[in-house]
């Protein structure tokens, strides 16, 4: 996997992973994806659809409409079929890091949301079950990061990390209650990040 970033050392890869997470958390999915694509030198997706920052869509490209993705600054572009066998590369790892940043942001929104609601005369966020769910989610995000750092060259581990992040986003969305299921919810970024991962993370024989 790391051969796709010529000259990169394990330490520099670690720094790139952390930077992709930081950008995803601070600036959002589109900025994070842009950082990951540039670092990985990615060109062709493993399938027929590429997820790209909207401002990087090639002129004249056929774009698959998706309102939620558009609001996140992401476009899904039809791509010419490649004769190369799909293979997991460094972009799958870096996109995983971006998704961790997006997931952390979603969890923080959930904590803020619950802090402003009360149940039984106290903030909902203080309820034992809610505290446990938040703690579990944060621990899982840390575990996902560690997996990318130490097992990023193991395709099955990278695919599993993306699956776990999808589950984490769903759990955080449920903490937002009904507001997590409207278009303008912060959960939108988590949903679109899953679609982006579906474009760039091949799921062949891992």
Predicted region positions:
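Short, conserved alpha-helical segments within structured domains
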Residues: 126, 130-133, 157-164, 187-188
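Glycine-rich beta->alpha junctions and the first turn(s) of the following alpha-helix
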Residues: 32, 36, 42-139
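Short, charged low-complexity intrinsically disordered segments located at boundaries
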Residues: 135-145, 198-203
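Glycine-rich phosphate/cofactor-binding loops in nucleotide/flavin-utilizing enzymes
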Residues: 1-37, 72-76, 176-206
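C-terminal helix-coil-helix/basic helical segment that borders enzyme active sites and/or dimer interfaces
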Residues: 122, 138-166, 170-183
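Generic detector of well-ordered alpha-helical segments enriched in charged/polar residues
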Residues: 14-18, 30, 34, 111, ...
């Amino acid at each position: 996997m790391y051969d796709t970033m010529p000259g990169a050392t394990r330490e520099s890869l670690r720094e790139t992973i952390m930077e992709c997470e930081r950008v995803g958390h601070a600036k959002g999915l589109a900025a994070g994806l842009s950082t990951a694509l540039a670092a990985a030198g990615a060109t062709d997706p493993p399938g027929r659809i590429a997820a790209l920052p909207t401002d990087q869509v090639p002129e004249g490209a056929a774009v698959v409409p998706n309102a939620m993705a558009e609001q996140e600054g992401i476009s899904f572009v039809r791509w010419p079929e490649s004769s190369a066998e799909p293979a997991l590369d460094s972009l799958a790892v870096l996109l995983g890091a971006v998704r961790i940043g997006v997931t952390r942001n979603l969890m923080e929104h959930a904590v803020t949301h619950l802090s402003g609601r009360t149940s039984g005369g106290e903030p909902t966020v203080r309820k034992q079950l809610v505290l446990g769910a938040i703690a579990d989610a944060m621990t899982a995000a840390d575990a996902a990061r560690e997996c990318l750092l130490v097992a990023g060259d193991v395709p099955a581990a990278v695919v599993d990390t993306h699956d776990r992040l999808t589950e984490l986003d769903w759990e955080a969305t449920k903490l937002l209650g009904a507001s997590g299921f409207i278009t303008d919810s912060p959960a939108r970024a988590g949903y679109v990040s899953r679609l982006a991962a579906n474009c760039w993370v091949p799921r062949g024989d891992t």
